[in-house]
Amino acid sequence: MIEIIAALSRWSQLTANLIIFGCCVFFAITMQHRSLSSTRWIERIERKFPWMAGIILSGLIGILATTTSEATGIAENLWNPYVWFDIVQQTQIGHIWIIRTLSAAFLLAITLYFIRLKRERWHYILVAIVAALPIIAGTFMSHSSADEMSFASIAPYAVHILLAGTWFGALPAILLLLFSDNAQSDAITATDKSGYLHKFSQLAMPVMLLLLVTGVIVTDRLVAGLYHTLVASNYGWLLNLKLSILAIILLIAYHVRNTWLPIMTKPGRDMDRQHSIFSLKKWVRIEFIFALLLVLIATILANTLPAKHSMVQNWPYPFRFSFNATDDPIAQEIIRLGMALFLVALGAIWLGIRSHWSKLKLVVIPGVLVLSASAIALPLMTLKSYPETYLKPSVPFDAVSISNGMKLFAENCVNCHGYQGKGTGNIIDPKVKDPTDLLTEPHTASYTVGNTYHYLTH
């Protein structure tokens, strides 16, 4: 129950914060067109800003309450403000919470003030800057700051969240723009709508690319080379789900940008234009629903044990892939060939989209290239695995462990591997690798500690 309250608190405050930030960025961009400042649909969302700022504050209170309960291990502290204040005063998390709460309160005050004034572009720029403050402060309570509280660790994650807000936060404004009543006296024309949407679409493309780049940087630090955890841990499965939802969103955004928006601006039949507007309304709504789900998954992911700290107690597959599967130079070149072919497949997808290939051609050609790349590279990278392959000792090695290991080695391994583990084979040809050499030959890189444990216990 506490975990559910914590997840909903984090999700609600982050969603509200991103919407205020993204809408203000969108308005600051489109306010270059003066006609936008006199429309009613923009007033509707402006009136929601103070309410959303209030949601941010209530979400932060929920975060403090659940954090206190989890930190103390006492469920009743969820409702005990006195213990909350102890956490706020005595912990670093509490100090960061104060900064987040003060910045959210400032955001509430400034939104209440500006909705009473005549609209100016600099108002939205200022509100966007203020809305960014709670977001940036929240990154100091993330996994990125857990290992090292430094600019290099936190900045990529902060930029990643702000870029996400630029895209996701603008979706409600775009929906209200699409659903604005054309019969109103201050309504904007379909041409103006398409102009605003096209301008945002031009901004969204580099934003999404930078979002992917910063996401890769942040994820790489949290995975730390332990890529097997991506298919065998809670963090990995949540990340895969997040990427799957993102792929659907990008597909919708591609069709919005390249199919329906051009029809709105192209002179032609009104029926085609109405159909494109209907499609935009339908699919942008669907995109927003997926975006809400994406933010929820990202919120849960941000509070899940990172992949680099995950313990894979039971590897569920009878195989694994490794670049150390072979030390044969020819085999390694073949693996590189397969990887190059996979990159060619990605290039074929990009070329097909740019050249407007048919759907069949766009699926078949990259599909054949991907299958060929897999058939070339994967067999050479495949190693046999066991449930214990990625198992790690739960305690550090000590003198007793080493002593017991020496006895086991002397009783079971000396005959083949020698007393020092350098092997017993008398190899004359330097090109031939001694398979019994456990000390100096590179073939031992294909074995994990868990594999060795499996061999000793079976």
What positions do the PLM features span?
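Periplasmic/extracellular electron-transfer cofactor-ligation site
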Residues: 400, 406, 410-433, 458
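Electrostatic cytochrome c docking/interface patches
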Residues: 385-408
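Extracytoplasmic electron-transfer domains, predominantly the class I c-type cytochrome c fold
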Residues: 430-458
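Conserved beta-strand positions that form and line the central face of beta-propeller blades
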Residues: 87, 391-395, 437
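Periplasmic c-type cytochrome electron-transfer domains
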Residues: 363, 367-368, 374, 402, ...
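Polytopic transmembrane helical bundles with strong interfacial aromatic enrichment
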Residues: 1-382, 386-388
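Inter-heme linker and motif-flanking segments adjacent to c-type heme-binding CXXCH motifs
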Residues: 146, 422-425, 444-445
